[in-house]
């Protein structure tokens, strides 16, 4: 299997070539976004047009199938950004804010079957990014078709406590974060909270509440790492006395996720170098340099720099310790 892992973006830009070439496939007068939640109290306006579901179906979903096929062509795995799009999208009427939108359903089973068919044809693993507000129906359908779910350390909880590795599902990709969330080092110092405050997507009251909650979560995470016997003997038990992410914490968190039974385990490129700033800050446009942060090194340089070699060695060590191995993953089932 080709080891490259690609991403299928959520939609086409309203000024993009797809919209100009296939105008009947898009709805004008509305934009897509997401409703208010804890991360974006005002909701999010992604400023792209929703699909014309009637026209897509009448055309046999050709445009959708071609976009999947082309993205799969040079890789062995495909991540579907916001996989809930196959089930419903949050439409915002023109001249209204994200608070005034509503969900509009799509023909999910048709779309998932097209996705599964292309997965088998191209022998590509499918990962559905199912974070945020997700109905039970979505995860049940993904599991039925063999599409991996997305399980992040930050969100996997049993009540307020972090879920132990053994309770993670098999049919999933696991990681600490995504491009939309805090890096590991940024999470530990609360840089993501400060970024939202600087961008004015949260006020000072929300900022203080989130800082208090983060302090509690850091202690819960540290407790979970100790409970999993991943921290070295004599290591500090009080998270308030650990001002920044240490090498020991990074190693233990990586081992925590490597120990899960989940099919895939992913380390984000920002974590080996302890980058503080995430790639994208949801709910912002000009307020944050979204997608403007370059990698510290080129792909060619990665093979020789110490940080990447150390990360590769750590991953090999955890693979050996956990018996995770590199077994093949089957494509989505029809």
Annotate each PLM feature:
Residues 5, 266-267:
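Short, well-structured secondary-structure segments
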Residues 11-264, 270-271, 276, 286-287, ...:
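Alpha-amylase-like alpha-glycosidases and glucanotransferases acting on alpha-linked glucans and related
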């Amino acid at each position: 299997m080709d080891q490259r892992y690609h991403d299928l973006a959520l939609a086409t830009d309203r000024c993009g070539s797809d919209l100009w070439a296939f105008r009947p496939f898009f709805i004008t007068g509305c934009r897509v976004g997401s409703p208010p939640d804890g991360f974006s109290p005002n909701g999010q306006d992604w400023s792209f047009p929703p699909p014309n579901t009637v026209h897509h179906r009448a055309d046999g979903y050709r445009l959708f199938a071609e976009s999947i096929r082309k993205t799969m062509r040079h890789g062995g795995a495909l991540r579907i950004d916001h996989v809930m799009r196959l089930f419903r999208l949050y439409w915002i009427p023109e001249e209204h804010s994200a608070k005034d939108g509503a969900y509009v359903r799509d023909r999910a089973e048709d779309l998932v079957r097209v996705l599964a068919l292309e997965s088998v044809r191209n022998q590509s693993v499918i990962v559905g990014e199912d974070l945020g507000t997700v109905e039970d129906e979505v995860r049940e359908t993904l599991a039925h078709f063999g599409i991996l779910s997305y399980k992040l350390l930050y969100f996997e909880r049993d009540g307020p406590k972090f879920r132990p590795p053994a309770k993670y599902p098999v049919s999933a990709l696991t990681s600490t974060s995504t491009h939309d969330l805090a890096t590991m080092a940024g999470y530990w110092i609360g840089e993501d909270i400060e970024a939202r405050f600087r961008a004015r997507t949260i006020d000072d009251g929300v900022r203080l509440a989130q800082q208090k909650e983060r302090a509690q979560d850091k202690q819960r995470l540290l407790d979970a790492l100790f409970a999993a016997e991943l921290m070295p003997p004599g290591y500090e038990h009080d998270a308030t006395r650990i001002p920044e992410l240490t090498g020991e914490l990074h190693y233990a968190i990586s081992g925590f996720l490597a120990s899960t039974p989940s099919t895939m385990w992913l380390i984000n490129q920002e974590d080996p170098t302890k980058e503080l700033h995430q790639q994208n800050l949801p709910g912002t446009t000009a307020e944050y340099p979204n997608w403007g942060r370059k990698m510290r090194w080129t792909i060619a340089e990665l093979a020789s720099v110490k940080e990447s070699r150390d990360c590769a060695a750590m991953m090999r060590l955890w693979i050996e310790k956990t018996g995770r191995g590199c077994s093949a993953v089957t494509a989505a089932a029809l």
